């Protein structure tokens, strides 16, 4: 590959990642603005279960209602945490929302030739990962682990006329978009560079057994940084090369952690927390993928 052709490939991949991700970032920041202006701390306190296990389950299942990609889920989760949602419930929501929503599950069903087993494995493992991690975090951390746990001037905005609330929603969405947008651009560029200059054949050569093939597919998912609505179509193209377990690892891990949303997490949360969270995700997704047969 010549320098010119590789640059053109990098450029096209970079732009395609941005085009794919920006609509979901917009959805995420708009929902974040709506939560800020229309949802009060009192409302959160009323609906959130006090029991830690029920709170984690509530957060995980709430992901069904939000057709959010992993690109847009960080701003929503951050806003919910600022509104008083416990960390364990917020993280459970953050991990499941990009996977168990109907749009993603339907695209998985179509991509794998109407195989319900793949849908159940993907949704089931995602739910299990989020529940286990949520419970662990409920014992490990007492605060929300945000870098900026409080935002002066961002309280009690839920009072005012509808027009004032809509104006506030728009202002918050714009601020949030520019806040997370720079990390999306950096992440998209790194992902494009790795896709251009790291050969897929190198990764394929490493995956010779169940453990290594799952790790390779998780690494590939991290590098490719695909949105969860389309990643199943890429995963299905590896069906003849990799086991179903490693494909499920690709589908679950990639929707929870990739280059662009890692940078967004580092911008929102404390670094130690992000490191621990990703460690938990890697270990539990890997263990779960080894149990998948088919």
From Swiss-Prot:
Where in or outside the cell it occurs: the entry states: Cell membrane
Q: Which UniProt keywords apply?
A: Cell membrane, Membrane, Transmembrane, Transmembrane helix
Q: Which GO terms describe its cellular component?
A: plasma membrane
**Superkingdom of the source?**
Bacteria
Query: Where does the chain cross the membrane?
Result: 15-35, 54-74, 92-112, 117-137, 174-194, 215-235, 247-267, 273-293
Q: How does the entry describe its membrane topology?
A: Multi-pass membrane protein
Q: List the disulfide bonds.
A: none
Pfam families hit by this protein: ArsP_1 (PF03773)
Q: Does the keyword Membrane apply?
A: yes
Keyword Cell membrane: yes or no? yes
Matching PANTHER family: UPF0718 PROTEIN YCGR
Q: Which family does it belong to?
A: Belongs to the UPF0718 family.
Q: What is this protein called?
A: UPF0718 protein YcgR
């Amino acid at each position: 590959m010549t320098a010119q052709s590789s640059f053109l490939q990098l450029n096209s991949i970079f732009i395609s990642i941005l085009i794919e991700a920006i609509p979901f970032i917009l959805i995420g920041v708009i929902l974040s603005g709506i939560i800020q202006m229309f949802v009060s701390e009192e409302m959160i306190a009323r609906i959130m279960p006090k029991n830690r296990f029920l709170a984690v389950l509530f957060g995980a299942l709430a992901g069904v209602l939000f057709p959010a990609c992993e690109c847009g889920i960080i701003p929503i989760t951050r806003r919910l945490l600022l509104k008083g949602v416990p960390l364990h419930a917020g993280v459970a929501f953050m991990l499941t929302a990009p996977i168990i929503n109907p749009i993603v599950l339907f695209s998985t069903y179509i991509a794998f030739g109407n195989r319900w087993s793949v849908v159940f494995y993907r949704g089931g493992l995602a739910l299990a990962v989020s529940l286990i991690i949520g419970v662990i975090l409920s014992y490990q951390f007492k605060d929300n682990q945000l870098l900026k746990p409080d935002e002066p001037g961002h309280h009690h905005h839920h009072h005012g006329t509808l027009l004032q609330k809509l104006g506030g929603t728009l202002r918050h969405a714009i601020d949030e978009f520019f806040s997370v947008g720079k990390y999306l651009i950096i992440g998209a560029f790194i992902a494009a560079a790795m896709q251009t200059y790291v050969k897929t054949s190198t990764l394929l050569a490493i995956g010779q057994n169940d453990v290594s093939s799952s790790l390779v597919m998780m690494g590939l998912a991290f590098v490719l940084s695909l949105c969860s609505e389309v990643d199943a179509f890429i995963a299905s193209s590896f069906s003849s090369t990799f086991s179903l377990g490693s494909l499920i690892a690709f589908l679950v891990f990639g929707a929870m952690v990739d280059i662009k949303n890692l940078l967004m997490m580092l911008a929102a949360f404390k670094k130690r927390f992000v490191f621990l969270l990703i460690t938990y995700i890697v270990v539990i997704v890997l263990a779960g993928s080894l149990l998948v047969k088919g």
